[in-house]
Amino acid sequence: MALFRKKDKYIRITPNNSLKGSVSHNVPEVPDELFAKCPACKHMIYKKDLGLAKICPTCSYNFRISAQERLTLTVDEGSFQELFISIETKDPLRFPGYQEKLQKAKETTGLHEAVLTGKAMVKGQQIALAIMDSHFIMASMGTVVGEKITRLFELAIEENLPVVIFTASGGARMQEGIMSLMQMAKVSAAVKRHSNAGLFYLTILTDPTTGGVTASFAMEGDIILAEPQSLVGFAGRRVIETTVRENLPDDFQKAEFLQDHGFVDAIVKRTELRDKIAHLVAFHGGGQ
């Protein structure tokens, strides 16, 4: 009877070992550098769609950009003259791994230190300019960063120039200990001398501006601008919540929150910063 008929066995096929891995070689790979994930809206974005300003087309999030990219966006073409290149970072505490970390940062960013300093023209207005780069050890402020910015203010006093600084930092550089913390007072003293000379100082807070930089020259500008949604603060959110034992607002330490509470004069879109800088410099006496 069919009910008790023995079922036929399946045919067994032995895989050919020579074919193993051949399929994977034929699958096209998508290069990692083609796309970027927006930290805000989580969308995957074709990098060319970000444009030169690197702004998310979906939610307008401002990606972090390098000092060189910001220079291209801000100053007149061919006008930038870099200064204080020869100042070298030392290792006063002989901190383990510090020299290796510095070398890697130099190779990755193409910078000598976490800040780019020099003179430039912005729509015909000459300025003394500093741009901090968070890709270089999170733009932490060590002795060289402090020295370069101090010298920039001293040069600006001698040449009667306004100073414009794009800030970005994770704070003082722990590998240099108290020498790093001293830069806060040193740069602030230079800012004061520049102010006493009747010269204009403009700061633009970018993401992130925290720690000792926030507690010193970042918040000492005659006018303080900020890019949208930039993180700006001193201590970290969790540290503050633990200390005060309260839950902080969701937008706490965002540029918009600081503007609402009088710490920032205006939030300016990245694509509009060049025009805004030129206007403010011209309005406050210019840098001809």
From Swiss-Prot:
Establish whether keyword Glycoprotein is in the entry. Answer: no
Compartments annotated for it: namely: Cytoplasm
Q: Which E.C. number(s) belong to this protein?
A: 2.1.3.15
Binding-site residues, Zn(2+): 38, 41, 56, 59
UniProt cofactor note: Binds 1 zinc ion per subunit.
Q: What does the record give as the reaction this protein catalyses?
A: N(6)-carboxybiotinyl-L-lysyl-[protein] + acetyl-CoA = N(6)-biotinyl-L-lysyl-[protein] + malonyl-CoA
Q: Where in this chain does the record put each CoA carboxyltransferase N-terminal domain?
A: 34-288
User: What does this protein need as cofactor?
Assistant: Zn(2+)
Q: Which GO terms describe its cellular component?
A: acetyl-CoA carboxylase complex
Q: Where are the zinc fingers (C4-type)?
A: 38-59
Q: What class of enzyme is it?
A: transferase
The UniProt entry, under Gene3D superfamilies, shows: 2-enoyl-CoA Hydratase, Chain A, domain 1
Q: Per the annotation, which location comes first and is thus the protein's main one?
A: cytoplasm
> Which GO terms of type biological process are on file?
fatty acid biosynthetic process; malonyl-CoA biosynthetic process
Q: According to its UniProt record, in which pathway does this protein act?
A: Lipid metabolism; malonyl-CoA biosynthesis; malonyl-CoA from acetyl-CoA: step 1/1
Q: Which GO terms describe its molecular function?
A: acetyl-CoA carboxylase activity; ATP binding; carboxyl- or carbamoyltransferase activity; zinc ion binding
Does the keyword section mention DNA damage?
no
UniProt keyword terms in alphabetical order: ATP-binding, Cytoplasm, Fatty acid biosynthesis, Fatty acid metabolism, Lipid biosynthesis, Lipid metabolism, Metal-binding, Nucleotide-binding, Transferase, Zinc, Zinc-finger
What is the similarity comment for this entry? Belongs to the AccD/PCCB family.
This protein's assembly is summarised as: Acetyl-CoA carboxylase is a heterohexamer composed of biotin carboxyl carrier protein (AccB), biotin carboxylase (AccC) and two subunits each of ACCase subunit alpha (AccA) and ACCase subunit beta (AccD).
Summarizing the function annotation, the protein's role is: Component of the acetyl coenzyme A carboxylase (ACC) complex. Biotin carboxylase (BC) catalyzes the carboxylation of biotin on its carrier protein (BCCP) and then the CO(2) group is transferred by the transcarboxylase to acetyl-CoA to form malonyl-CoA.
Name the PANTHER family for this protein: ACETYL-COENZYME A CARBOXYLASE CARBOXYL TRANSFERASE SUBUNIT BETA, CHLOROPLASTIC
Cited HAMAP family: AcetylCoA_CT_beta
Which protein are we looking at?
A: Acetyl-coenzyme A carboxylase carboxyl transferase subunit beta
Gene that produces this protein? accD
